[in-house]
C-alpha cells in the first residue's frame, strides 16, 4: 500500500532554521519556520525522535498531533494557500551517525568531538521538522548556536555572514534544494583553501589530529574536478563554495551535501608522500563522485527514491570519466573494470536481486535500495553503455539540455533519456528500459550451427538456482566483426561463420571493451580460435576473457578446472589489469580446499608457480623510475607469494619489519600491508597484536589504519583473537563505522572465523542498536555470505538470519545471501575433485 506523500499536503518554499546544539547535555533545541503553500488539511510535516513544544500558523497557536509511527506532525492549519508554519522543538543528540551527531577523536591524548550531520535518506527530520522528501525543494536560512569554545568554527552549505549578539552563526540563504542535502558542522578544525578559475571557494577541512599535508591531495582534486565538470556539463557550479569535510565518525563513504560535502577520513585525507597509487585513485574517485553529484543529484534531483539510480549511477560513471580527464596516466577505467564491472556482474547473477529502478512506497524501504552493486555499479555500467553508443559530444549535448530544463528541480529517468535522445537518432529510452526495470543480465551464447552459420542466443544468466522468466534485453553487442549494433531478439543468425571470419581477419568476439552488461559463452570453435590468438588481446580483453570464464564456472556452465591452465598462461603479464583478473579467479579456487589439507598445499604451490617469477623480477622494494604498472602489480604478487608460504618472501618481509619496527608507519605504503600481515601470521603473538592495536589507536593516517586492521585480523593466535573480538564493542578501539571491516577480516581468517561468527550471533541486539538504522547494516549479512561456503555454515546462517527475514532493511539481503551460500555449496560439491585434479596437474 502506498504511503501518503507529505508534499501533497504542503509545498515548502523557504525554511528559517534556528538550531541550538548543546554537546554537554546532548540536546538539540530549535525552531523550524516554514513558508509555503497549504494544499490539504491537515498538513503533514516530518519529525523523528522529537518533542514538539508548539506549532504556530501565521503567528497563531494551532492544534497538532505527533504520529510517531508515521514520523509525522499532523497540523490543523485552518488555511489553504500561502502560510507560515513555525514549529518549536527539542531532540536528543545521539551517537547513531544520523541526523545531527558527534564525531569523536583524540588530539594529544585528549578526547575531543566535532558535530556533523548526515541527512540522506530520511534523517533531516531528526534535525528539524520539514517535508523530508526529495521533491519538496526549498531555500534554507540557517542560524546555528552551540556551546562554543575558543578556536571552533562552523560550516554549512553556504558561507557564514555574521554572528549575532545571542551567539547564533548565520549563513547565507541556500539555493532551492532538497532537505536531505542540508548540512552543517562545527568544532576545532584545520583547513586549506583555494579558488577555481571562476572564483568558487574550494576548501578541505579536518580535525587537527591530522598532518596539514594530508589535506593537499583532496584540495587539488576538488578544485580541478569542479573546473572539469563545469566544462563537461557546460553548466556553471551554482554556489560560491565547495567545502570538503572529513568526519572521524561517518556511516557512509561520503555524502554530497550541496556546498559542504562530508567524507570518512579514509576517503578524503592521505599522506601525499606515502600512500599507494591504488589508494590515491580510490580517494580521487570518491571526491569526484561526490562533486559529480553537485549537478547530478543536487542541481537536478530525483523526484522520488525509486529514481535513486539517477543520482548514483551517473555520479559513479562520472567519477571515472573525470579522473581520467584529470589524471590520464592513471588509466582509471581499468579500475572501473576490476571494481564496478566485477561487482555488478557477481551480484546481478543471483536470483532475487533488485532491478536498478524499483517501486518504493514506504520510506522504511528506501535504505534497502542502496545496493551498491546494483544502483551504483550496475547503473554506472548502463551509463557507460549509453556513453559508448552516443559518444562524448552527444552525451555532453544531451546533458546540457537536461540541466537547462530541470535545474533546481526534480527529474525522472525518462527525463534523462528524453534529453539524451535530443542528441542522437537512437531511442535511448527504449534501449535502457529492459536494463533498468528488470533484474539480472544475459549470457549470449555464440556458436557455429550445423549449417555453418554463426548464431547468437540470449538468456538470463544465474549463479545458483534461478527461475527463467523469459526476460529479454536490448544488448549493445560491441562486436569486432560485422554484426548488428543492438541484439533485440532471443536468437539471431549472422550468416556464414567462414565468411565473417575471413572478412574480419581475426577471431570473432563480442562485448569488445567490456562496456556492455552481459557475458559471452563461445562454443569450442570460437573459444579455441580466441585462445590461439590470446597474446594479441589487449589487457581489457584478457580481463574480460577471465571474467566471463570465471562467471560461467560459478554458474556451472563450464568447469573451473578448465580455467587453471589459462592462469598459468597469463602469469607473466606486465599488465596490472590482467594480474588483478588472474588473482581474482585464483582466489575462487580457495573455496575448493580445506584449510591445511593436502589440496591446499597444492593450491599454495600453484600460487607460488604463478607469483615466483614476478616476485623475482619486482622484488620487495620499489625501484626508482619504476612504471605505474609494476608498482600496481607488486602487491598482488607479494600477497600471492605469502599465501604460497614462499620461504624467501617470508624472510624478506620479516627482515623489512625488523629493520623498520620503530617506525612502521614510514614503511612504503605499497608493501606495508604485506610486511605487517606476514609478521603477524608467521612471527607474531598476542603481544605483537596488542602493540599493533595500540598503533592503530595512535595513528590518524587512514590508509595506515587499514593496513594495521588487515594485519591484526589475520592473526592465528587464539588469545589475540579473543582480545580482538572483545574490542569490537569498544568504540575507543573500533569505531562503529569500521566494525564491519574488522568483522569481515576476522571472519575470513580460518583461525578467527568461529569467534567472529559467535560474536555476531551472541551480540546481534547490541549491533542492531548501534548501527541498525543505517543503510550499511545489511553489509554484515553480505560479508558473512561472502565468506561462508560449507553446508555446516549454510545451516547456521539460515538458522540465525531467516527469523529476521521480515525486517524491511534486511529481508532482500537475507533471501539473496541464502542463495549465494547455497550456490557455493553446490558448486564445491560438483567441482571439487575436478578443480583439485587440475591444480595438481598444473604444478606437476
Curated annotation (Swiss-Prot):
Q: Where in the cell is it found?
A: Cytoplasm
The annotated site for Transition state stabilizer falls at: 376
Q: Which InterPro entries match?
A: Aminopeptidase_N-like_N, Aminopeptidase_N-like_N_sf, ERAP1-like_C_dom, M1_APN-typ, Peptidase_M1, Peptidase_M1_aminopeptidases, Peptidase_M1_dom, Peptidase_M4/M1_CTD_sf
Q: EC number(s)?
A: 3.4.11.2
One biological process term from GO is: peptide catabolic process
The protein's required cofactor(s) are namely:
Zn(2+)
Q: Which residues bind substrate?
A: 120, 253-257
Tell me, in one coarse class, where this protein mainly resides: cytoplasm
Q: Which GO terms describe its molecular function?
A: alanyl aminopeptidase activity; metalloaminopeptidase activity; peptide binding; zinc ion binding
The UniProt catalytic activity note for this protein reads: Release of an N-terminal amino acid, Xaa-|-Yaa- from a peptide, amide or arylamide. Xaa is preferably Ala, but may be most amino acids including Pro (slow action). When a terminal hydrophobic residue is followed by a prolyl residue, the two may be released as an intact Xaa-Pro dipeptide
Q: How is the cofactor bound?
A: Binds 1 zinc ion per subunit.
- Annotated active site: 290 (proton acceptor)
GO CC term (a single one): cytoplasm
Instruction: Keyword check for Protease, yes or no.
Output: yes
**Protein keywords:** Aminopeptidase, Cytoplasm, Hydrolase, Metal-binding, Metalloprotease, Protease, Zinc
So where does Zn(2+) get bound?
289, 293, 312
Role this protein plays:
Aminopeptidase N is involved in the degradation of intracellular peptides generated by protein breakdown during normal growth as well as in response to nutrient starvation.
Under the subunit heading, UniProt states: Monomer.
- Which PANTHER family has this protein been placed in? PROTEASE M1 ZINC METALLOPROTEASE, PUROMYCIN-SENSITIVE AMINOPEPTIDASE-RELATED
Family indicated by similarity: Belongs to the peptidase M1 family.
Full protein name: Aminopeptidase N
User: What organism, scientifically named, is this protein from?
Assistant: Lactobacillus helveticus
In the UniProt record, the gene name given for this protein reads pepN
Amino acid at each position: 500500500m502506498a504511503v501518503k506523500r507529505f508534499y501533497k499536503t504542503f509545498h515548502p518554499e523557504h525554511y528559517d532554521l534556528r538550531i541550538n546544539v548543546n554537546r554537554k547535555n546532548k540536546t538539540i533545541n530549535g525552531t523550524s519556520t516554514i513558508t509555503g503553500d497549504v494544499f490539504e488539511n491537515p498538513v503533514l510535516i516530518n519529525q523523528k525522535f522529537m518533542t514538539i513544544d508548539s506549532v504556530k500558523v501565521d503567528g497563531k497557536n494551532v492544534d497538532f498531533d505527533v504520529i510517531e509511527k508515521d514520523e509525522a506532525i499532523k497540523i490543523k492549519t485552518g488555511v489553504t494557500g500561502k502560510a507560515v508554519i513555525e514549529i518549536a522543538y527539542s531532540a536528543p543528540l545521539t551517537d547513531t551517525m544520523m541526523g545531527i551527531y558527534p564525531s569523536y577523536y583524540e588530539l594529544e591524548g585528549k578526547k575531543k568531538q566535532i558535530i556533523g550531520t548526515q541527512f540522506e535518506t530520511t534523517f533531516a527530520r531528526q534535525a528539524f521538522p520539514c517535508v523530508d522528501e526529495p521533491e519538496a525543494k526549498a531555500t534554507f536560512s540557517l542560524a546555528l548556536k552551540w556551546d562554543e569554545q575558543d578556536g571552533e568554527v562552523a560550516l554549512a552549505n553556504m558561507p557564514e555572514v555574521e554572528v549575532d549578539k545571542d551567539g547564533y552563526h548565520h549563513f547565507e540563504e541556500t539555493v532551492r534544494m532538497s532537505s536531505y542535502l542540508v548540512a552543517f558542522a562545527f568544532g576545532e578544525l584545520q583547513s586549506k583553501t583555494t579558488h577555481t578559475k571562476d572564483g568558487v571557494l574550494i576548501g578541505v577541512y579536518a580535525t587537527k589530529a591530522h598532518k596539514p599535508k594530508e589535506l593537499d591531495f583532496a584540495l587539488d582534486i576538488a578544485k580541478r574536478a569542479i573546473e572539469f565538470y563545469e566544462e563537461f556539463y557546460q553548466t556553471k557550479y551554482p554556489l560560491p563554495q565547495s567545502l570538503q569535510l572529513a568526519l572521524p565518525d561517518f556511516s557512509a563513504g561520503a555524502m554530497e551535501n550541496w556546498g559542504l560535502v562530508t567524507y570518512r577520513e579514509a576517503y578524503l585525507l592521505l599522506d601525499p608522500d606515502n600512500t599507494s597509487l591504488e589508494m590515491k585513485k580510490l580517494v580521487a574517485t570518491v571526491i569526484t563522485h561526490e562533486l559529480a553529484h553537485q549537478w547530478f543529484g543536487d542541481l537536478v534531483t530525483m523526484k522520488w527514491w525509486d529514481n535513486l539510480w539517477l543520482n548514483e549511477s551517473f555520479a559513479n560513471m562520472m567519477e571515472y570519466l573525470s579522473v581520467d580527464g584529470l589524471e590520464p596516466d592513471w588509466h582509471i577505467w581499468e579500475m572501473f573494470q576490476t571494481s564496478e564491472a566485477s561487482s555488478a556482474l557477481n551480484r546481478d547473477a543471483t536470483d532475487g536481486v533488485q532491478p536498478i529502478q524499483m517501486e518504493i512506497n514506504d520510506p522504511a524501504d528506501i535504505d534497502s535500495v542502496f545496493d551498491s552493486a546494483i544502483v551504483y555499479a550496475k547503473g554506472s555500467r548502463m551509463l557507460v553503455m549509453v556513453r559508448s553508443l552516443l559518444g562524448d559530444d552527444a552525451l555532453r549535448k544531451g546533458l546540457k539540455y537536461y540541466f537547462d530544463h530541470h535545474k533546481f528541480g526534480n527529474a525522472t529517468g525518462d527525463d534523462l533519456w528524453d534529453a539524451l535522445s535530443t542528441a542522437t537518432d537512437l531511442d535511448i529510452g527504449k534501449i535502457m528500459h529492459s536494463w533498468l526495470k528488470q533484474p539480472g543480465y544475459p549470457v549470449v551464447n555464440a556458436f557455429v550451427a550445423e549449417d555453418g552459420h554463426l548464431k547468437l542466443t540470449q538468456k538470463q544468466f544465474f549463479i545458483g538456482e534461478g527461475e527463467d522468466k523469459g526476460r529479454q534485453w536490448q544488448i549493445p553487442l560491441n562486436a569486432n566483426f560485422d554484426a548488428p549494433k543492438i541484439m533485440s531478439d532471443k536468437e539471431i543468425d549472422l550468416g556464414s561463420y567462414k565468411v565473417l571470419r575471413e572478412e574480419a581477419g581475426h577471431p570473432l568476439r563480442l562485448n569488445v571493451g567490456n562496456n556492455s552488461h552481459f557475458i559471452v559463452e563461445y562454443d569450442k570453435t570460437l573459444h579455441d580460435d580466441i585462445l590461439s590468438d590470446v597474446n594479441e588481446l589487449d589487457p581489457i580483453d584478457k580481463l574480460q576473457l577471465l571474467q566471463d570464464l570465471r562467471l560461467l564456472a560459478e554458474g556451472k556452465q563450464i568447469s573451473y578446472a578448465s580455467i587453471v591452465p589459462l592462469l598459468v598462461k597469463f602469469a607473466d603479464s606486465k599488465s596490472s589489469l590482467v594480474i588483478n583478473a588472474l588473482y581474482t579467479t585464483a582466489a575462487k579456487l580457495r573455496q575448493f580446499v580445506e584449510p591445511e589439507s593436502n589440496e591446499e598445499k597444492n593450491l599454495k604451490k600453484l600460487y607460488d608457480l604463478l607469483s615466483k617469477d614476478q616476485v623475482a623480477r619486482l622484488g620487495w622494494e620499489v625501484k626508482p623510475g619504476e612504471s605505474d604498472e609494476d608498482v600496481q602489480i607488486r602487491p598482488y604478487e607479494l600477497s600471492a607469494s605469502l599465501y604460497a608460504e614462499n620461504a624467501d618472501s617470508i624472510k624478506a618481509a620479516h627482515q623489512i619489519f625488523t629493520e623498520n619496527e620503530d617506525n612502521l608507519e614510514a614503511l612504503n605504503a605499497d608493501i606495508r600491508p604485506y610486511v605487517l600481515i606476514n609478521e603477524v601470521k608467521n612471527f607474531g603473538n598476542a603481544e605483537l597484536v596488542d602493540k599493533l592495536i595500540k598503533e592503530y589507536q595512535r595513528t590518524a593516517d587512514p590508509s595506515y589504519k587499514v593496513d594495521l586492521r588487515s594485519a591484526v585480523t589475520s592473526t592465528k593466535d587464539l588469545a589475540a583473537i579473543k582480545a580482538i573480538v572483545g574490542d569490537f564493542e569498544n568504540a575507543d578501539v573500533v569505531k562503529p563505522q569500521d566494525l564491519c571491516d574488522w568483522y569481515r577480516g576476522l571472519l575470513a581468517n580460518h583461525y578467527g572465523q568461529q569467534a567472529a561468527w559467535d560474536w555476531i550471533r551472541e551480540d546481534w541486539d547490541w549491533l542492531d542498536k548501534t548501527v541498525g538504522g543505517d543503510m550499511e547494516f545489511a553489509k554484515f549479512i553480505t560479508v558473512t555470505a561472502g565468506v561462508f561456503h560449507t553446508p555446516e555454515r549454510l545451516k547456521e546462517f539460515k538458522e540465525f538470519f531467516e527469523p529476521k527475514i521480515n525486517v524491511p532493511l534486511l529481508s532482500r539481503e537475507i533471501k539473496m545471501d541464502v542463495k549465494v551460500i547455497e550456490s557455493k555449496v553446490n558448486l564445491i560439491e560438483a567441482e571439487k575433485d575436478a578443480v583439485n585434479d587440475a591444480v595438481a596437474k598444473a604444478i606437476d
